[in-house]
From Swiss-Prot:
UniProt-listed PANTHER family: CHLOROPLAST PROTEIN-TRANSPORTING ATPASE, SECA INNER MEMBRANE COMPONENT OF SEC PROTEIN SECRETION SYSTEM
UniProt record, GO biological process: intracellular protein transmembrane transport; protein import; protein targeting; protein transport by the Sec complex
Membrane topology field: Peripheral membrane protein
Protein name in UniProt: Protein translocase subunit SecA
GO cellular component entries: cell envelope Sec protein transport complex; cytosol; plasma membrane
Record EC number: 7.4.2.8
Family, as annotated: Belongs to the SecA family.
Keyword set, alphabetical order: ATP-binding, Cell inner membrane, Cell membrane, Cytoplasm, Membrane, Metal-binding, Nucleotide-binding, Protein transport, Translocase, Translocation, Transport, Zinc
Length: 916
């Protein structure tokens, strides 16, 4: 109450911000006549003038009024569109690194040009981020003439683009692309072995279109670059036969083998279920008699079993995925679009493939990953636009430090939002939906029907076909026609069934989108110019009459077939109607069989229903029910926010490590001379090894000199008799031994460098270091994943899982760095070179150097080899056979995950075991 009183007296934070922005709008408007008086050449010259003023020390804020006035006038001349005052406010909000909430049809694409133009003047690049390739190409194509007129270049990043083209696109002043492409390019740039292969510049300023979709809806989905891992494909097929033999529990405490928790999207095996599963697996021969699924040796079986259960119980065809060209393609739960190239992790995708009987592809190993939260926080300045951000304003502020500013509409909204109608069953609900559509169609009112899944959209389509109503279906299966269908959804009597928010980003114009139709005529090569002009003229004459008919019929009518988990998605659907002051209406139809009501509002809602007890086919409209449903949505939003926040808290740990790794990697890539760094690494590696067997401040009796000598020989090819040093000099200590060993290694290394040439050795060192970092980082990511999956169990020991995760991750990262340094030092000091005359080596081009000892690899060949090959050759100079058969013959037992006996430091399965 006190808050409301304060708002009435002082105004809300949003009101105060708008008041400040309106003062700047007045300054921009005052410059309009001056800009209109300029010739095209003079207006274009303003860009060079602004750049010079910035170079002279002026700030972007200082030139904002003039820059916005120039952009507005250029837009009027080039595009025929003049920015409204509210659009100027939106541009300033974006420039200030905030989120502009603007209703559908208010011209967000045009708003972005103001902030993009101003920030592009700094010469550091601006990224405009959209949700798909079509919108990126479309928006860039529409706005490129404006930017070109103002002397700025535009690039577009789309999937399947070659690296050279990507470099050119990123080098442009303004770059359009999708969130996925920008994120993956960042990861790929941090995997290159040559700095000139990088495509991105610094991450300076980003304007994110549909910011809620990208920063909220996709925040739980990390970007992952992966490679194939060792995997048993047959096990997925075998496990796929197990779930049908297990009994699903009706309730959490009921009888059965497993409980499906739809809220948490998890499957939980009961005690009975474990026993039953063990019996089945024992009969199949996968589990030994009296063995347990919980034993360490059977972790893989448990992993595959749970993946199979989740695939059968939680993931459904045409809702969570579709089968396309013999492949499982994920459906985006928020937009209904197909996510080609995306795969579920942890064996789930393979389990779904086994369930559907399609080809099972190997599970992947993570090579690099980042969440959208952490990627977009890398930008110096971030801003965004959407029609619905206010419900998630707290999340934007707390996670991204982005304030949301609600921009007033240019014209008052005239859409009528009717109360929800609630039915007992889904059947009754869909009958009412068809009846409403039929009535709208009779009076010529266009209808957009929103569904939450492909399955429901096809159900509505079948009902409409049965009723004889012509319609278009827009779901993930119709992605190619998406924009065209949405553009014509405002025609007289049009009926469009859309999955979730598919088609978002394309305006629905009452009477139909004339531009799409005229573009289609102009592109028709079968028509002559005269025929094209005649058809376009006829089209333009007929459009106004159709537009007026739709206006009279009540504008676009929105029908929601169920409430979404988030109020924001509902608002997005409603927002498709009533653009720029047009009339429109919306209504949601619900049933007690809908997932939201069934899972989150069932008990109290059912009690209300029983009291009201309507007849079949009669809808309930009641404030109590509406509040109950909104309460359920808030619960789900809160739960989803907590999940995203938890993902971020855990990823923040990995993110700090990622920054260190990528920073070190970048330093190696860009440094001309890494000799000092290499010397430090060799010194540290030797010191650590000596400290292991001669601990500081320990007694001589505690030293293990024979093992130290063996390790030095194996790791660094140093044949030293340290025991004789100790006998010869009683005063010698660990530090003296370190200094002697380091001196020996440095002398030998200097001799090798002299033989092959400094540049060849530097290139070799750089390549070895990068590959060592990449391989060890990949192993570290896998270890972090395993740690993350099991860390929740620490809570049973009264420990905080997050604190435990941070502590263990820090220890693992220290081990990672030590491992990388030791690995590099060991490999580089083990390479031996033939004692050929230096002059002979120097006379030859680097690529032709063949002066390599017969037992050791050629450095130039090593530069092109994989890390496994590098290590294998360098650590096996005498050609010892480390195959499983040879080891067995020598009586050595080496398991796949044991260190390779060659001394490489890699696991056996990744070294000589892999080669075998």
């Amino acid at each position: 109450m006190l808050t409301n009183i304060a708002k009435k007296i002082f105004g809300s934070r949003n009101d105060r911000l708008l008041k400040q922005y309106r003062k700047s709008v007045a300054r921009i408007n005052a410059l309009e006549e001056q800009m209109q008086a300029l010739s095209d050449a003079d207006l274009q010259a303003k860009t060079a003038e602004f750049k010079q003023r910035l170079a002279d020390g002026q700030t972007l804020d200082g030139i904002l009024p003039e820059a916005f006035a120039v952009c507005r006038e250029a837009s009027r001349r080039v595009l025929g569109m003049r920015h409204f005052d509210v659009q100027l406010i939106g541009g300033m909000v974006l420039h200030d690194g905030k989120i502009a909430e603007m209703r559908t049809g208010e011209g967000k694409t045009l708003v972005a040009t103001l902030a993009v133009y101003l920030n592009a003047l700094a010469g550091k690049g601006v990224h405009v981020v959209t949700v798909n390739d079509y919108l990126a190409s479309r928006d860039a194509g529409i706005m490129e003439p404006l930017y070109n007129f103002l002397g700025l270049t535009v690039g577009v990043i789309i999937s399947d683009m070659q690296p050279f083209d990507r470099q050119n696109a990123y080098a442009a002043d303004i770059t359009y692309g999708t969130n996925n492409e920008f994120g993956f390019d960042y990861l790929r740039d941090n995997m290159v072995t040559d700095q000139y292969d990088k495509v991105q510049r610094e991450l300076n300023f980003a304007v994110v279109d549909e910011v809620d979709s990208i920063l909220i809806d996709e925040a739980r989905t990390p970007l992952i670059i992966s490679g194939q891992a060792d995997d048993n494909i047959q096990l997925y097929q075998i496990m796929n036969t197990v779930p049908p033999h297990l009994v699903r529990q009706e309730t959490e405490e009921g009888e059965g083998d497993y409980w499906v928790d739809e809220k948490a999207h998890q499957v939980i095996l009961s005690e009975t279920g474990h026993e039953h599963a063990e019996q089945i697996l024992t009969q199949m021969g996968l589990l030994a008699e009296n063995d347990s699924l919980y034993s360490a040796a059977n972790i893989s079986l448990m992993h595959h079993l749970m993946a199979a259960l989740r695939a059968h119980s939680l993931f459904h065809k045409d809702q969570h995925y579709v089968i396309q060209d013999g492949e499982i393609v994920i459906v985006d739960e928020f937009t209904g679009r197909l996510m080609s190239g995306r795969r579920w992790s942890e064996g789930l995708h393979q389990a779904v493939e086994a369930k559907e009987g399609v080809e099972i592809k190997r599970e992947n190993q993570t090579l690099a990953s980042i969440t959208f939260q952490n990627y977009f926080r890398l930008y110096t300045k971030l801003s965004g636009m959407t029609g619905t951000a206010d419900t998630e304003a707290f999340e934007f502020q707390s996670i991204y430090n982005l304030e949301t500013v609600i921009i007033p509409t240019n014209r008052p909204v005239q859409r009528k939002d009717f109360n929800d109608q609630i039915f007992r069953s889904a059947e009754e609900k869909f009958e009412a939906v068809v009846k409403d559509i039929e009535e709208c169609h009779k009076r010529g009112q266009p209808v957009l029907v929103g569904t939450t899944s492909i399955e429901n959209s096809e159900l509505v389509s079948r009902l409409l076909q049965k009723a004889g109503l012509p319609h278009n279906v827009l779901n993930a299966k119709e992605h190619e026609r998406e924009a065209l269908i949405v553009a014509q959804a405002g025609k007289v009597g049009a009926i469009t069934v859309a999955t979730n928010m598919a088609g978002r980003g394309t305006d629905i114009v009452l009477g139909g989108n004339l531009k799409h139709q005229t573009d289609a005529i102009r592109a028709d090569e079968t028509l002559s110019d005269e025929e094209k002009q005649a058809q376009i003229a006829a089209l333009e004459n007929g459009w106004q009459a159709e537009h007026d008919k739709v206006m009279e019929a009540g504008g676009l009518h929105i029908i929601g077939t169920e409430r979404h988990e988030s109020r924001r998605i509902d608002n997005q659907l409603r927002g498709r109607s009533g653009r720029q002051g047009d009339p429109g209406s919306s209504r949601f139809y619900l049933s007690f069989e809908d997932p939201l009501l069934r899972l989150f509002a069932l008990d109290r809602a059912a009690a209300i229903l029983n009291r009201l007890a309507p007849e079949r086919g009669v809808a309930i409209e009641h404030n109590l029910l509406t509040r109950q449903i909104e309460g359920a949505q808030r619960k789900v939003e809160g739960r989803n926010f907590d999940m995203r926040k938890q993902v971020l808290e855990y990823d923040d740990v990995a993110n700090e490590q990622r920054k260190v790794i990528y920073s070190q990697r970048n330093e190696i890539l860009t440094s001309k001379d890494i000799g000092d760094l290499m010397q430090e690494i060799r010194s540290d590696a030797v010191s650590d090894l000596v400290d292991t067997y001669m601990p500081p401040d320990s007694m001589e009796e505690q030293w293990d000199i024979p093992t130290l000598e063996n390790r030095l020989a194996a790791e660094f090819r140093l044949q030293e008799d340290i025991q004789s040093w100790l006998k010869a000099d009683n005063a010698i200590d660990g530090q003296d031994i370190k200094e002697r060993l380091i001196e020996r290694i440095e002398n030998e290394y200097a001799a090798k460098t002299e033989l092959v040439g400094k540049q060849a050795m530097a290139d070799f060192e750089r390549n070895v270091m990068l590959q060592a970092i990449d391989n060890q980082w990949r192993e570290h990511l896998a270890a972090m994943d395993y740690l993350r999956q099991g860390i929740h169990l620490r809570s049973y020991a009264q420990k905080n899982p997050k604190q435990e995760y941070k502590r263990e991750a820090f220890t693992m990262f220290q081990d990672l760095w030590n491992g990388i340094k030791f690995h590099i030092a060991s490999l580089l000091t083990s390479v031996q070179i033939e004692q050929n005359p230096v002059a002979a080596v120097e006379e030859q081009p680097v690529g032709n150097i063949q002066s390599i000892h017969s037992e050791s690899p050629d450095i130039e060949e090593l530069l092109g080899q994989s890390q496994t090959d590098l290590v294998t050759e360098a650590f096996n100079p005498d050609g010892t056979d480390f195959s499983p058969e040879a080891l067995e013959a020598r009586g050595q037992i080496v398991h796949r995950n044991d260190p390779c006996p060659c001394g490489s430091g890699l696991k056996y399965k990744q070294c000589h075991g892999k080669l075998a």
